[in-house]
């Protein structure tokens, strides 16, 4: 399986996101390929700032709203490019994730600190939403998508914020041969959830 990794700058706006999708599609049509996605540019910085500021009981609205706007900008652009893109469903997913984040921020404020598990849960949301947007992009183009489930398929050792993956065991668990060659394969570049 060929693996293509896309960092945040490659997913920063609708045009770049679409270019990354086209590269994954081209590789998929040539051989079995997987796209590994980071959060769009600036998202991880916003998410990290959210938990840090909440722990200090500082305002988080600016980071929260700017992060949501980055995602909305991307999905609006993808929908403008292809009106089959599930704009309403993807927006609902983004809203649900940010509602969860809002609840976690309130817990952090009340505790006056952020636990590693909660921090990792917030920090990985950007990758999770990149996967959701890319999945919607491919489905709008008629593709089936397989998302590598990190909980079931990747064996990691270490803490929530610093872990390493057991490549040999994870390769067995992912088992590329069992994934239909017709499926576009996507996985998050960082995950804790």
Give a label for each model feature.
Residues 1-193:
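Nucleotide/pyrophosphate-binding catalytic subdomain
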């Amino acid at each position: 399986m060929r693996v293509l990794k896309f960092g945040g700058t490659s997913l920063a706006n609708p045009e770049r996101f679409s270019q990354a999708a086209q590269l994954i599609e081209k590789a998929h049509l040539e051989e079995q390929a997987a796209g590994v996605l980071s959060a769009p540019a600036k998202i991880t910085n916003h998410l990290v700032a959210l938990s840090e500021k909440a722990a200090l009981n500082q305002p988080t609205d600016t980071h929260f709203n700017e992060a949501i706007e980055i995602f909305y900008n991307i999905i609006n652009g993808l929908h403008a490019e292809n009106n089959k893109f599930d704009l309403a469903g993807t927006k609902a997913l983004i809203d649900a994730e940010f509602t969860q984040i809002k609840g976690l921020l309130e817990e952090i404020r009340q505790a006056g600190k952020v636990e590693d598990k909660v921090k990792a849960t917030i920090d990985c949301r950007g990758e999770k939403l990149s996967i959701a947007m890319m999945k919607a992009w491919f489905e709008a183009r008629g593709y089936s998508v397989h998302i590598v489930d990190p909980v079931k398929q990747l064996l990691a050792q270490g803490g929530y914020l610093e872990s390493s993956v057991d490549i040999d065991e994870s390769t067995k668990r992912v088992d590329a041969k069992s994934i239909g060659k017709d499926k576009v394969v996507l996985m998050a570049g960082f995950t804790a959830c």
